[in-house]
C-alpha cells in the first residue's frame, strides 16, 4: 500500500510487519478569540503532538500530513479607528524545512523585534529552532477584515518508530504545529481560524484529545524536548 495515495481515505486502519496499526484521520475545528498588541500562540489541533506512545524501545507520534487554514481577522479598534497592522504566523517545531512545502520555509524566531510578550512563550517550548510555514504582516483599516486560506503539506511516511537513542528525524516527524497572531491595536478585535487537517494517528491516540482547540501556550507544560 502506498500511504501517500491513501490520503483521501479517512478513518482506516493500516499495519504491516514493521509498524503497529495507525489510522488516517481527518479533523476539522473552529476557534474565535480576541487579538490585540499582547498577541498569543495557540494550537490549531485538538491533540498535542508531544504526547508520545512508547512501545518497548520505540516511540510513536501522531503525524500531520496536510493542514488547511481559513483565517479571518477583524480590526475593531474603536479607541482610535485608525488603520493598524496584524502579523499572522504559522510555524512548527523542530526545524524540518526541507520536508515542508517542498522546502519553502525559513528558520528564525518570528517574534524577535516584533512582540516581546510572545518571545518567552516560544522559548519555553522549544530550544532547537523552528520552521516558519507562513509569516505575513497585513495592514487593516478600521472595521476591515483580513481573510486568507493556507495549505501546508508535510512529506514523509506515517508513524514510523523513533528508537530511544535517535532524536527527531526531520523526514518523518513534526513535533508540534502552532499559530501565532499579534496586532498593533487595542480593543475587541476578532481572530477566527478554521482548520482542516489529515493525520496519521497511532491506534493508542485514537479519539484521545489532550488539548482544547485554540488553547494558549501559557497554559501548557514545558515538555517539548523528548531527546533531552
Swiss-Prot record:
Annotated GO CC locations: host cell cytoplasm; host cell nucleus
Transmembrane segments: none
Subcellular location, principal: host cell
UniProt-annotated location(s): Host nucleus; Host cytoplasm
InterPro entries according to UniProt: BNYVV_p25/p26
Record key words, sorted: Host cytoplasm, Host nucleus
Family to which the UniProt record says this protein belongs: Belongs to the benyvirus P25 protein family.
Job description of the protein: Probably influences symptom severity in a synergistic fashion with P25.
UniProt-recorded name of the protein: Protein P26
Record organism: Beet necrotic yellow vein virus (isolate Japan/S)
Source species taxonomy: Viruses, Riboviria, Orthornavirae, Kitrinoviricota, Alsuviricetes
Amino acid at each position: 500500500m502506498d500511504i501517500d495515495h491513501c490520503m483521501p481515505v479517512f478513518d482506516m486502519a493500516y499495519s504491516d510487519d514493521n509498524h503497529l496499526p495507525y489510522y488516517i484521520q481527518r479533523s476539522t475545528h473552529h476557534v474565535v478569540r480576541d487579538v490585540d498588541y499582547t498577541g498569543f500562540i495557540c494550537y490549531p489541533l485538538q491533540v498535542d503532538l508531544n504526547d508520545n506512545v512508547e512501545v518497548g524501545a520505540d516511540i510513536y507520534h501522531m503525524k500531520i500530513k496536510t493542514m488547511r487554514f481559513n483565517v479571518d481577522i477583524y480590526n475593531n479598534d474603536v479607541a482610535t479607528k485608525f488603520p493598524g497592522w496584524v502579523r499572522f504566523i504559522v510555524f512548527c517545531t523542530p526545524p524540518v524545512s526541507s520536508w515542508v512545502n517542498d522546502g519553502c520555509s525559513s528558520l528564525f524566531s518570528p517574534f524577535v523585534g516584533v512582540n516581546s510578550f510572545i518571545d518567552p512563550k516560544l522559548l519555553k517550548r522549544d530550544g532547537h529552532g523552528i520552521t516558519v510555514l507562513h509569516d505575513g504582516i497585513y495592514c487593516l483599516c478600521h472595521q476591515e477584515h483580513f481573510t486568507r486560506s493556507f495549505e501546508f503539506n508535510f512529506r514523509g511516511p506515517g508513524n514510523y518508530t523513533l528508537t530511544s537513542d535517535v532524536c527527531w528525524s526531520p523526514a518523518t516527524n513534526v513535533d508540534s504545529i502552532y499559530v501565532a497572531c499579534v496586532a498593533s491595536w487595542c480593543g475587541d478585535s476578532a481572530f477566527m481560524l478554521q482548520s482542516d487537517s489529515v493525520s496519521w494517528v497511532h491506534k493508542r491516540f485514537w479519539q484521545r484529545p489532550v488539548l482544547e482547540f485554540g488553547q494558549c501556550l501559557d497554559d501548557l507544560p514545558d515538555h517539548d524536548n523528548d531527546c533531552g
